[in-house]
Amino acid sequence: MIQWLMNIDRRIIFVFVFLGVALPLLANVFLPIKPTRDVIAVYDQFEKVAEDEGIVLLSFSYGASTEPEMQPMARAILRHCFSRNIKVVAVCLWPEAPGLARKVLEEIGDEFGKIYGEDYAFLGFKPGNFAVVLNMGQDFRDAFPQDNWGTPLEKLALTRDVRTLRDFDFVFDLAAGDSIEFWWIPYGQEKYGFPFAGGCTAVMAPDLFPFLQSKQMVGLLGGLAGAAEYETLVGRQDKATAGMSAQSMAHLIIVAFILFGNMAFFLSRRR
């Protein structure tokens, strides 16, 4: 038995790893996920907006290369907003983002029977990076005079009374780059003082922790793990939960085989 453990056929390991990844993705076998403090803070802020029947601004600042991490996050947030009748205005500050933003808005909007122009609006892409954020804070309609299809904002019931960023009860940036720390915080939140939070790729999350400590951000969703935690809070397990469960099960299987191999090695030395 000890000798067998020390010489396990690699194909057996591959089969176990395959099953560990396939079960969550194909059979919806999920591991429990415990939401962290920063994710709960974002959820609670959206709940405060819902209590006041408020309006939020979602900024899409990611592209196709980070879709696997960011799109599940957007889906979970929109499900929360639409299930609680929160009004959503969406903008894009990355040129790759409009297609992804429109897709998820229409998908989740149809899921909850939401009406465009009344429950949500999509204003499309605007070039300029931080200058757009600054412009939205001064005169929102100067930055975005019309929606993605050319309809003036004053003709949409949802955006008729929106003048500046201060008219939003909450601003949330879905970021794959540096838009949170270099655009939204210095030129938006710090200047105009609105409640702000963000979601980012996992590799970016540590860079944003100082903004949580300084209270410039209400909370933070970091990568696929943050999206999975938010799905848990919303009560709808989706792609993020499946992806994190697949990763976790694969890691557990690999660690188990490492432990078995080391145990077999030390036991063989005793003989």
Question: Language-model features: where?
Answer:
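Membrane-proximal low-complexity regions enriched in glycine and acidic/polar residues
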Residues: 117-205
